[in-house]
Regions:
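Structural microenvironment flanking redox-active thiols in thiol-disulfide oxidoreductases
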Residues: 89-99
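Structural micro-motif
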Residues: 53, 102-110
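Hydrophobic heptad-repeat coiled-coil signature
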Residues: 63-66
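Proteins that catalyze or organize thiol-disulfide redox chemistry
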Residues: 1-55, 61, 71-79, 83, ...
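Short coil/turn motifs that cap or connect alpha-helices
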Residues: 92, 104-107, 116
Length: 138
């Protein structure tokens, strides 16, 4: 009888340990987001509300200045992985968010902290300017 309880207790311990490891792995994955994530109307709210610092790049495929800053956004995402989450929102495919935040010029970067707007940056600015505007919120 005691042996059966020991076996059952060990199974429970192993299951709990596995659950804790999964949660830990999930946290590590989130901390190491090192490239811009695709954001849609459906995922926007959850994305901006669930991170301490999020930068959403509002862009369109036909926009030349948007394509010019895309590599800068990629670099910043790598350099600030674990500190800042970068997202890309295609304004042509996600009109609800575009209208809600009155995106009339692109590229526009919106900086959020847990869903609250901290800054709105419009135009294809050089990396040092973008970096300074974003990192002041760290």
């Amino acid at each position: 009888m005691a042996n059966e309880k020991d076996v059952e207790l060990e199974k429970l311990r192993q299951a709990r340990l596995l659950e804790m490891l999964k949660k830990s792995k999930s946290f590590e994955d989130e901390a190491l987001i090192n490239k811009p994530i695709d954001v849609t109307d459906a995922t926007f709210s959850e994305t901006v509300q669930s991170h301490p610092l999020v930068v959403i790049d509002c862009w369109a495929a036909w926009c030349g200045p948007c394509r010019m800053i895309a590599p800068i956004i990629e670099e910043l995402a790598r350099e600030y992985a674990g500190k800042v989450v970068f997202g890309k929102l295609d304004v042509d495919k996600n009109r609800a968010v575009s209208m809600q935040y009155q995106i009339v010029s692109i590229p526009t970067l919106i900086v959020f902290s847990y869903g609250k707007i901290l800054d709105k940056i419009t135009g294809a600015l050089p990396k040092p300017v973008l970096e300074a505007r974003i990192t002041r919120y760290l």
